[in-house]
């Protein structure tokens, strides 16, 4: 749901400070499995491709990861898809019963030549098998094939999508939305996304997975105080392999491209820390709507 209040900007600053403090505590524990922070994408590390892998039409551009193509004139192009992912496999679970919890945060902006009338299709943060590849463009967001997009038995991916175009042919929602997707383009949980802000200002997303409760929680925030939240139970070990690839996948049907401006990720076997982060996410959303 959309939550907005004139005082929420200050409250969100307080929340983010507390959240980062808690995140640093998670990173400092011996149970941390994977942890990285890209405060921006200006450095040579990202430019040389040592930390980020690009597939399809995704590429590095000074200051950002661009997921889909633009023309020589800088205008986003139709009908293409791309992925930018972390270069190392990420541990998710093992046969002894260990399951990782994780927290990720990233900022992004969407560009289009025809806002807000015709723009499509969006992008997603995803977890998939290490050997997965870029698939179809448009509403498939590079994660699915059109012929099997709604068949969970044919797919293996969990994603949080930022969908700028409602694909009604899949019985999808009839408005832009944020969704949690499990092996299908049809989301298992959604919230309406009044996404005009995404085209003119930076968006910041926070996503947690609590291995104990098996809940994925999503919070999207804007500097103007707007924010959106949703959550859903997803049993990741029943869906994904022990080690996965994580990253971003975007697709276009109309003229749009998506830029990832910053990205941090940490996973841990200490689900208590992630539970605390999740509670802060939910508390922030509830408090700033008062």
UniProtKB/Swiss-Prot annotation:
Domain of life of the native organism: Eukaryota
Keyword Manganese: yes
SUPFAM superfamilies, A to Z: Concanavalin A-like lectins/glucanases
Binding locations of Ca(2+): 163, 165, 167, 172
GO process annotations (BP): defense response; regulation of defense response to virus
Task performed by this protein: N-acetyl-D-galactosamine specific lectin. Displays antiviral activity and therefore may contribute to defense against infections.
Family to which this protein belongs: Belongs to the leguminous lectin family.
The protein, known as: Lectin
